[in-house]
Curated annotation (Swiss-Prot):
CC terms in the record's Gene Ontology section: cytosolic small ribosomal subunit
Keywords, in A-Z order: Ribonucleoprotein, Ribosomal protein
Species of origin: Paracoccus denitrificans (strain Pd 1222)
Protein name listed in UniProt: Small ribosomal subunit protein uS2
An example Gene Ontology molecular-function term: structural constituent of ribosome
InterPro entries assigned: Ribosomal_uS2, Ribosomal_uS2_bac/mit/plastid, Ribosomal_uS2_CS, Ribosomal_uS2_flav_dom_sf
One GO term of the biological process aspect: translation
Coiled coil (residue ranges): none
Family membership noted in the UniProt record: Belongs to the universal ribosomal protein uS2 family.
Length: 261
């Protein structure tokens, strides 16, 4: 069952400002091949290259999820935080949007223990925190909030991701280095002031404008959802029947009950 990848046009990329790079003096020469020219001291990204490269990146996201893989969205800069979390949640994937904790991938065992601690705190506090003093409870709530901020997006990941999707490779260089070490492929938006080194699937484009970030995140989440649909199709799940059964549960009445009425 071959689902279509999310559609996007050159015009959408232009409207979102994907073509605006950084000031020419801040450029990274390694990005020279993806630069179309300059305008008013700003490098302009060659969108005729971005289009097929973005398409290839979306294909990888889709294929990874279709094989049952997990995608980890990484974007900790202020203007990426919400878009990254929303897109990952919408497509049942995972995210780091607070601060990359060194060792998140390379020291997964320790990170898993912190996730277990977060789940234990949730349980204790969720059940009314019986027998705790006010002070103990406050300390627990503080620890819970801290862990939730840094690990909330990966608490259900259950193991290493199969693919990273990164916004701003300069800021997230730690994440990329860890993925490289473990052989986890990286899809990333790479601006004109960055190096594409260590990125397996480069998307040349602006990594600062909120509209551009929202567009990448939306497309990647839709590609992941396409992958889930393909995975269900391959597993022989009849999506029509699945929707009908969900509908049935919502109305709370099965055919037998209707017949008995």
């Amino acid at each position: 069952m071959d689902m279509a990848l999310p559609e996007f046009s050159m015009r959408q990329l232009l409207e979102a400002g994907v073509h605006y790079g950084h000031q020419t003096q801040r450029w990274n020469p390694r990005m020279a091949e993806f630069i179309y020219g300059e305008r008013n001291g700003i490098h302009i990204v060659d969108l005729t290259q971005t289009v097929p490269m973005l398409d290839a990146a979306l294909q990888v996201v889709r294929d990874t999820v279709a094989k049952g893989g997990r995608v980890l969205f990484v974007g900790t800069k202020r203007q990426a935080q919400k878009a990254v979390a929303d897109a990952a949640e919408r497509s049942a994937q995972f995210y780091m949007n607070h601060r990359w904790l060194g060792g998140t991938l390379t020291n997964w065992k320790t990170v898993s223990q912190s996730i277990q601690r977060l789940k234990a705190l949730d349980e204790t506090l969720g059940s009314g925190a019986e027998g705790l003093t006010k002070k103990e409870r406050l300390q627990m709530e503080r620890e819970q909030a801290k862990l939730q901020a840094s690990l909330g997006g990966i608490r259900e990941m259950g193991g290493l991701p199969d693919l990273l999707f990164v916004i701003d490779v300069n800021k997230e260089d730690l994440a990329i280095a860890e993925a490289k070490k473990l052989g986890i492929p990286v899809v990333a938006v790479v601006d004109t002031n960055c190096s594409p080194k260590g990125v397996d699937y480069v998307i040349p484009g602006n990594d600062d404008a909120a509209r551009a970030i929202a567009l990448y995140c939306d497309l990647v989440s839709r590609a992941a959802l396409d992958g889930m649909t393909a995975q269900m199709g391959a597993a022989g799940v009849d999506l029509g029947a699945l929707e009908a059964s969900v509908e049935e549960e919502l109305t709370g009445e099965t055919a037998e009950e209707a017949a008995e009425a």
